[in-house]
């Protein structure tokens, strides 16, 4: 079986954040996960280990692979279920499995921002490049996936450079500010706390800082990085360990860390609400897995929003750019066809290689035979003639045998094929006497 492309995954279209956080891969787990995935196929009859890459973000977890194993689809879904200890019947309804051209089209759309919650957002492209880099370091990236991703990045650049897909997009950060303005009439009068110091927190800090909040604080596990971000926006840093004791000081809390467990629990928020005398707290949890226990959202005077909640506001901005979407989809469709042509060409490489190997083996055998004839004193012209006749007979033996064995439509197809190989071959009617 030829190498086949396959994408297995879940995203914000198919699964809620409660499930997405359970199948997310922390960065430090991706290389070991790729190793275990490849080991799944060691006992299978397919001769080649699969190529694989894992893309894990707030909105999606996807496994891209290239394999010649016919059972790859079911094996990949079963592996994802087993790895995360999620019952297969619970995970399966939310999983999509995209073969060949569908996998290519999906990769192009994801990198171009067409499949994002924030239409046209650029962060996903960097995340995909990081996924490819990690797969390369893990030794799980081969010819097929490497070519797929290089084409993917080129298509994303073309889409973003020739369409308005990223223009006037409502980012998650901007959506968070809009929601805060629904709770607090003036964000400028509020104290804002950011937990984390990654790209998403940086974007949120940019948008909230533009509102001129009363105070801006950054709490991060790495104090130096948190202080650097806070200084950039005229704020201050605070140790993450101080969060439980100081949570009541803040009106707005935005969190996005890489923690695999919640860092804000129900009890801590209950104490903060009590200390605030029930003044409202606006909380945004942009992390997957979530940073804030979901039960917090049930508390009176707490307004908790997740990435899925912000999606509704984001989609309002997406609707106005459908012309750009259509233009981008047209570009992608053309590039998908181009890539599939390359993939089809790759599928004949093993056949061509085998033909060369067979022909070379025949050549070497006949040359050795000719050398022996010359060594015993045979006439060189006779040796050359014998060599050429032997090569001719052996090289056309396969095609002529196939023609003799074929019947009906198969025979006609083979005859047409041979005419293509040997352009001056006569038609069957041309062999009759005239």
Swiss-Prot record:
On the tree of life, the source organism's domain of life is Bacteria
What the entry lists under InterPro entries is as follows: 4pyrrol_synth_GluRdtase (IPR000343), 4pyrrol_synth_GluRdtase_dimer (IPR015896), 4pyrrol_synth_GluRdtase_N (IPR015895), GluRdtase_CS (IPR018214), GluRdtase_dimer_dom_sf (IPR036453), GluRdtase_N_sf (IPR036343), NAD(P)-bd_dom_sf (IPR036291), Shikm_DH/Glu-tRNA_Rdtase (IPR006151)
Write the record's keywords in alphabetical order, separated by commas.
NADP, Oxidoreductase, Porphyrin biosynthesis
Q: Where is this site: Important for activity?
A: 106
Which Pfam families does this entry report, sorted A to Z? GlutR_dimer (PF00745), GlutR_N (PF05201), Shikimate_DH (PF01488)
Q: Which reaction does it catalyse?
A: (S)-4-amino-5-oxopentanoate + tRNA(Glu) + NADP(+) = L-glutamyl-tRNA(Glu) + NADPH + H(+)
For this chain, the family text in UniProt reads: Belongs to the glutamyl-tRNA reductase family.
Q: What does this protein do?
A: Catalyzes the NADPH-dependent reduction of glutamyl-tRNA(Glu) to glutamate 1-semialdehyde (GSA).
Additional detail:
During catalysis, the active site Cys acts as a nucleophile attacking the alpha-carbonyl group of tRNA-bound glutamate with the formation of a thioester intermediate between enzyme and glutamate, and the concomitant release of tRNA(Glu). The thioester intermediate is finally reduced by direct hydride transfer from NADPH, to form the product GSA.
Q: What's this protein's name?
A: Glutamyl-tRNA reductase
Gene this chain is encoded by: hemA
């Amino acid at each position: 079986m030829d190498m086949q492309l396959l994408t297995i995954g879940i995203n914000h279209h198919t699964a809620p954040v409660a499930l997405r956080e359970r199948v997310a891969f922390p960065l430090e787990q991706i290389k070991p996960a790729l190793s275990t995935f490849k080991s799944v196929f060691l006992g299978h009859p397919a001769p080649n280990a699969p190529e694989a890459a894992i893309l894990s973000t707030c909105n999606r977890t996807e496994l891209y692979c290239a394999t010649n194993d016919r059972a790859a689809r079911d094996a990949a879904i079963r592996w994802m279920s087993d790895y995360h200890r999620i019952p297969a019947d619970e995970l399966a309804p939310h999983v999509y499995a995209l073969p060949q051209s569908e996998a290519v089209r999906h990769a192009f759309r994801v990198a171009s921002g067409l499949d994002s919650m924030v239409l046209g957002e650029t962060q996903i492209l960097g995340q995909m490049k990081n996924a490819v880099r990690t797969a390369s370091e893990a030794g799980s990236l081969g010819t097929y996936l490497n070519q797929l991703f290089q084409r993917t990045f080129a298509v994303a650049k073309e889409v973003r450079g020739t369409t308005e897909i990223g223009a006037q997009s409502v980012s998650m950060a901007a959506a968070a500010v809009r929601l805060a303005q629904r709770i607090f009439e003036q964000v400028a009068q509020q104290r804002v706390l950011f937990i984390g110091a990654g790209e998403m927190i940086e974007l949120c800090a940019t948008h909230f800082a533009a509102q001129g909040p009363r105070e801006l604080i950054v709490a991060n596990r790495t104090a130096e990085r948190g202080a650097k971000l806070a200084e950039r926006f005229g704020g201050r840093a605070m140790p993450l360990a101080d969060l439980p004791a100081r949570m009541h000081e803040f009106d707005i809390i935005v969190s996005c860390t890489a923690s695999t467990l919640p860092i804000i629990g129900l009890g801590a928020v209950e104490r903060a609400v009590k200390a605030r005398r029930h003044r409202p707290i606006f909380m945004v949890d942009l992390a997957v897995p979530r940073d804030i226990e979901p039960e917090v959202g049930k508390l009176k005077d707490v307004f908790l929003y997740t990435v899925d909640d912000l999606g509704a506001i984001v989609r309002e901005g997406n609707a106005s750019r459908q012309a750009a979407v259509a233009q981008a989809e047209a570009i992608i469709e053309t590039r998908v066809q181009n890539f599939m042509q390359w993939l089809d060409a790759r599928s004949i490489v093993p056949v061509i290689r085998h033909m060369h190997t067979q022909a070379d083996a025949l050549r070497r055998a006949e040359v050795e035979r000719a050398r022996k004839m010359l060594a015993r004193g045979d006439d060189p012209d006779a040796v050359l003639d014998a060599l050429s006749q032997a090569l001719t007979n052996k090289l056309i033996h396969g095609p002529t045998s196939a023609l003799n064995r074929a019947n009906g439509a198969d025979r006609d197809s083979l005859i047409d094929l041979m005419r293509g190989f040997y352009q001056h071959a006569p038609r069957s009617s041309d062999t009759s006497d005239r």
